[in-house]
């Protein structure tokens, strides 16, 4: 195309439709997952796997944070599009957990919701809370969480993974080519997270997972350890050096 070399970028674990079309014209495709789904075998030689590219602020965080034994800090976030499902259904899960455990919740709400009205039940149940609407790089400023409940966009999961925050993934069920589920499954296969599908979601599902963690932390600690191993050698300098070297070679 115009005698220019084309290098594609694919953060998801299944190739996007635009990238799939352009791949035949491209020199290489940079991706996070060496087992990228949906790619024709004849193009496998074009794959270049790299560690997730995050905002520089993420590489400056101390990710070896000890859990606070006095309370459970939970993050709920739905990504750039937020999640009406999370806003409508996850409050009851937090209330249920608070009856047995001391809980602190940081929750992203869908636009249009009244923050003050939404938090009343949290306050009435003595749940420390921080409610917010979508913010770019929110986790750069707030990252001391024991567990997260999240949609499964590639960037959101990469940020949680880098910060060693085990997460319960609830993929957006209408994502193109089911890419959010496939993103989450990659981490599930590496024993880094739990997955709940929205279509099968029942009241108490979050409680069951978190209660199991509180009773026996072995599985939780294993997931946290696996996340740490995924990112132990990833630094801002190393990732940028690798990219610069690659572009200079091509």
Language-model segments: which ranges?
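Active-site-proximal region of nucleotide-activated glycan assembly enzymes
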Residues: 2-62
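Short hydrophobic beta-strand element within catalytic cores of glycosyltransferases
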Residues: 150, 166-177
């Amino acid at each position: 195309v115009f005698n220019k070399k084309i290098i594609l970028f694919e953060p998801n674990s299944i190739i996007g439709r635009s990238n799939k079309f352009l791949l035949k014209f491209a020199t290489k495709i940079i991706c996070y997952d060496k087992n990228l789904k949906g790619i024709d075998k004849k193009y496998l030689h074009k794959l270049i796997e790299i560690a997730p590219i995050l905002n520089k602020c993420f590489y400056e965080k101390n990710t070896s944070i000890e859990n606070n034994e006095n309370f459970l800090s939970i993050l709920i976030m739905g990504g750039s599009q937020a999640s009406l499902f999370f806003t409508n259904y996850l409050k009851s899960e937090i209330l249920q957990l608070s009856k047995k455990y001391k809980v602190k919740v940081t929750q992203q709400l869908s636009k249009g919701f009244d923050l003050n009205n939404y938090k009343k039940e949290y306050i009435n149940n003595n749940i420390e809370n921080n409610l917010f609407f979508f913010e770019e790089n929110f986790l750069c400023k707030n990252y001391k969480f024991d567990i997260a409940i999240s949609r499964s966009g590639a960037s959101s999961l990469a940020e949680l993974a880098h910060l060693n925050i085990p997460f319960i993934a609830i993929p957006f069920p209408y994502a193109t080519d089911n890419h959010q589920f496939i993103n989450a499954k990659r981490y599930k296969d590496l024993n880094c997270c739990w997955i709940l599908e929205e279509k099968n979601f029942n009241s108490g599902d979050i409680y069951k997972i978190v209660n199991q963690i509180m009773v026996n932390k072995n599985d939780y600690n294993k997931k946290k350890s696996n996340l740490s191993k995924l990112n132990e050698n990833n630094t801002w300098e190393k990732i940028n050096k690798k990219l610069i070297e690659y572009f200079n070679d091509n």
